[in-house]
């Protein structure tokens, strides 16, 4: 009997090996037939065995299939489906070029293919195309990726009009924002009213809110992965646009057809150009009228994207990409009176620079390799320079103060995709990053004839840190219904002879209840070694990036989520997700502190440490195709904070906690040349802190020698029982827009018009208490709000050629 068991076991092993040997590998790339652009996430599906995969971020796919006849379908949203019968006898390379479906000009895809969302293990993932972004009406008509993402459930916008975003109760520093794989530390133009991402230069946008794969790390709340266009390798193309704030120009084309291509895109505002002649005339008029005053106010924003890629051979490809962006504001005020001259100069500027050199190598039909070297540099600086001179007394003085901060990263990473069998898709890799921080450096210089000169520098001029990562994950099918993505992310961080390490498990899974219905669950652990000290005083870009130190621990979080996805005839997709997130070792300024206090102390002395708790439900209904497209999102959420030194250690709501958040986004194609867009938003008001008691105190009066001294003017002293103890009024608005297209010869021209806040709702930008006295001399305190963005129309013009 024992011999029989051995024979049966060996026979089963031989049979399994024989079956395994009957499989072959089909691999290749999927690209746009007209431009050569890789189609990220293209679907490759075997209709015979009902197994499939998706192309990676570089268009590469690999799929294990049985020997013999196979019917394979290649598809991508907005492109013609390609089906083919293939008789496979060995490993085969099939490179696919999909044609855009010209009959689908009206179709806008707001996320990935609905059926793919049902079958994948991904949770909390949103994908956007540039076409989607272009049809969403926005503030002043500036198409903006970030503002479109703010319309998704689980994503808060923060202050009205801003380009920051807050995911599932997390802070802005907890979003890993990648441009071609390079971290971007500041996404704001125009003091936050625009983002730095020029949508004309963008090919693909993916936001992950939960269930993070092991290949991502270093942040707690989300991953925003943005990929720039690679450039058309078939023919020269371009587009340009003129708006109220800025103008853009994008050019792309082949350097060597089918092998080498480029893409360049630039954007610049023109406030300084328009304002210059008016300011010059005003200064000349003052001079002619004997007023010795000269004033100049200037502001501009600009950014520039460049990408070049070259196909070395069928297995190798190289990319080089750059981004640089800058905001600069300056104020000069010079005046003279008799013998005296005063000169006041104020300046504020910030910007990002990123670059990436990437090499793709298809090592075999089962193995893909990507090696990347990157640089990311973010700088912020402001200065104030005051000069005084008196020619009569022959005296002069000068005071200069400068504050700046900087983060610079050099990184090298290698990533592998490995497909050992049709049930498995393995990703693994490693990276090393050198961070360089200048967290809040203040320079002060003072000179005069009567005082000793001052020349001092405060803060850390350069603080290096090193971060290392190793990860591995496997997306595998247990059976036809159950699929799991499991992985580990290991990281280590060293700064000032202190080393922190973290082993972070990641697991997510889906179970197919029916072919068009799945339930999903995930658990992830994350650790973040960088902190952002958000300035608590005003809205300038004075946020300070600081590293983990011996005194300040890394931020840690874990998140679990459950949900379900249902696709109705591939026309509608319904998603519901519930999540719970716990965050530890958050930092914030202590009560009353801000970056100005850095002059007299280290930033570590100004912060307090606490924790956060976030949970909620998200609902999303999408209609991704047809004449009417769009989505409806609803979020029910709670986000609380706990700091021992704040609020007596008690719980208080996060400043961007909103109980209810609703967004309805729709686009309707009336004809091929006319489309309409509308957005309606409703949100519970954000919390803010208001004193619950006020006292009058004669703080500068005292009695000495039997006499009263001081002004005896009362001063109001406020008592704050709790932080964020009041809420602003609820927020809602309607934005509408229309695009009119006209095709002439080889160009398409578009006029866009629209209205932001179409029904003129006075939403609060901020709220403040106001003391009022009535006719009976009775004093009361009332809340008043300041509204900035009422009814704002826009117009823009664009051309594609």
Predicted features along the sequence, with ranges:
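A beta-strand signature from Gram-negative outer-membrane beta-barrel systems
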Residues: 96, 151-152, 196-235, 248, ...
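Gram-negative outer-membrane beta-barrel transporters
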Residues: 580-582, 605-690
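C-terminal beta-signal and adjacent terminal beta-strands/loops
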Residues: 274-277, 673, 681-714, 729-735, ...
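Outer membrane beta-barrel strand-and-loop segments of large Gram-negative receptors
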Residues: 409-413, 458-464, 469, 553, ...
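Transmembrane beta-barrel wall of Gram-negative outer-membrane proteins
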Residues: 245-269, 287-331, 350-371, 420-421
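Surface-exposed extracellular loop regions of Gram-negative outer-membrane beta-barrel proteins
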Residues: 328, 379-381, 443-444, 449, ...
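Short, acidic, small-residue-rich periplasmic hinge/interaction motif at the N-terminus
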Residues: 31-35, 42-47, 75-79, 89-137, ...
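Short acidic/polar hinge/loop motifs at secondary-structure boundaries
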Residues: 62-64, 135-137, 182-209
């Amino acid at each position: 009997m024992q011999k029989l068991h051995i024979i049966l076991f060996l026979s089963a092993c031989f049979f399994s090996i024989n079956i395994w040997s009957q499989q072959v590998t089909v691999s290749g790339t999927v690209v746009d037939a007209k431009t050569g652009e890789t189609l990220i996430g293209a679907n490759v599906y075997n209709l015979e065995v009902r197994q499939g995969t998706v192309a990676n971020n570089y268009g590469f796919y690999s799929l294990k299939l049985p020997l013999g006849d196979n019917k394979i379908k290649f598809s991508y949203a907005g492109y013609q489906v390609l089906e083919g019968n293939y008789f496979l006898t060995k490993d085969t390379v099939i490179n696919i070029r999909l044609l855009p479906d010209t009959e689908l000009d009206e179709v806008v895809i707001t996320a990935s293919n609905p059926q793919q969302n049902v079958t994948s293990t991904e949770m909390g993932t949103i994908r956007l195309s540039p076409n989607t972004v272009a049809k969403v009406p926005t503030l002043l008509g500036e198409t903006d990726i970030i503002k479109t993402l703010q319309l998704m459930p689980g994503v808060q916008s923060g202050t009205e009009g801003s380009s920051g975003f807050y995911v599932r109760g997390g802070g802005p520093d907890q979003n890993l924002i990648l441009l071609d794989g390079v971290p971007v530390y500041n996404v704001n133009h125009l003091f936050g009213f625009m983002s730095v991402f020029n949508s004309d230069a963008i090919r693909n946008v993916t936001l992950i809110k939960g269930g993070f794969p092991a290949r991502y790390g270093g942040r707690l709340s989300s991953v925003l992965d943005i990929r720039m266009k690679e450039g058309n390798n078939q023919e020269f193309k371009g587009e340009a646009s003129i708006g109220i704030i800025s103008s853009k120009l994008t050019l792309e084309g082949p350097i060597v057809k089918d092998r080498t291509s480029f893409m360049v895109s630039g954007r610049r505002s023109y406030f300084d150009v328009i304002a210059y002649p008016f300011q010059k005339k005003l200064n000349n008029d003052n001079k002619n009228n004997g007023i010795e005053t000269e004033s100049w106010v200037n502001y501009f924003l600009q950014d520039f994207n460049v990408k070049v890629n070259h196909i070395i051979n069928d297995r190798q490809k190289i990319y080089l990409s750059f981004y640089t962006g800058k905001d600069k504001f300056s104020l000069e005020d010079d005046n003279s009176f008799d013998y005296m001259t005063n000169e006041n100069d104020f300046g504020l500027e910030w910007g990002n620079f990123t670059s990436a050199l990437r090499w793709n190598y298809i090592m075999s039909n089962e193995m893909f390799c990507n090696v990347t070297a990157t640089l990311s540099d973010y700088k912020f600086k402001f200065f104030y320079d005051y000069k005084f001179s008196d020619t009569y007394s022959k005296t002069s003085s000068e005071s200069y103060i400068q504050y700046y901060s900087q983060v610079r990263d050099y990184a090298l990473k290698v990533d592998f995709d490995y497909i050992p069998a049709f049930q498995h898709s393995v990703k693994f890799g490693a990276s090393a990053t050198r961070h360089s921080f200048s967290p809040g450096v203040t320079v002060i210089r003072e000179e005069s004839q009567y005082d000793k000169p001052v020349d001092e520098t405060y803060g850390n001029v350069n603080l290096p840190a090193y971060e290392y990562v190793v990860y591995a994950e496997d997306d595998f099918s247990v059976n036809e219904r159950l699929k799991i993505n499991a992985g580990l992310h290991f990281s280590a961080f060293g700064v000032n002879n202190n080393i922190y390490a973290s082993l972070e498990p990641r697991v997510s899974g889906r179970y197919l209840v029916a072919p068009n219905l799945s339930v999903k669950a995930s658990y992830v652990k994350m650790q973040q070694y960088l902190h952002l000290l958000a300035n608590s005083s005003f809205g300038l870009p004075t946020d300070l990036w600081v590293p983990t130190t011996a005194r300040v621990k890394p931020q840690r979080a874990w998140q679990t989520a459950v949900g379900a996805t249902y696709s109705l005839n591939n026309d509608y997709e319904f998603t519901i997700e519930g999540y719970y997130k716990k965050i530890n070792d958050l930092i914030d300024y202590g009560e009353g502190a801000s970056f100005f206090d850095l002059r007299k102390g280290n930033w570590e002395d100004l912060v307090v440490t606490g924790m956060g708790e976030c949970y909620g439900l998200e609902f999303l209904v999408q209609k991704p195709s047809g004449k009417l497209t769009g989505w409806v999102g609803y979020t029910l959420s709670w986000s609380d904070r706990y700091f021992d030194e704040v609020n007596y250690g008690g719980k208080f709501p996060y400043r961007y906690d909103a109980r209810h958040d609703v967004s309805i986004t729709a686009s309707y194609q009336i004809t091929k040349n006319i489309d309409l867009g509308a957005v309606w938003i409703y949100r519970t008001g954000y919390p803010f802190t208001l004193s619950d008691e006020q006292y009058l105190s004669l703080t500068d009066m005292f009695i000495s020698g039997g006499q009263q001294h001081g002004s005896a003017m009362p001063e109001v002293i406020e008592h704050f029982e709790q932080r964020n103890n009041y809420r602003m009024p609820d927020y809602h608005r309607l934005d509408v827009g229309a695009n009119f297209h006209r095709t002439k010869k080889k160009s398409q021209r578009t006029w866009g018009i629209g209205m932001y806040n179409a029904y003129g709702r006075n939403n609060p930008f901020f709220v403040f208490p106001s003391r009022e006295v009535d006719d009976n001399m009775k004093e009361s305190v009332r809340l008043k709000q300041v509204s900035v963005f009422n009814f704002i129309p826009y117009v823009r013009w664009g051309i594609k050629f």
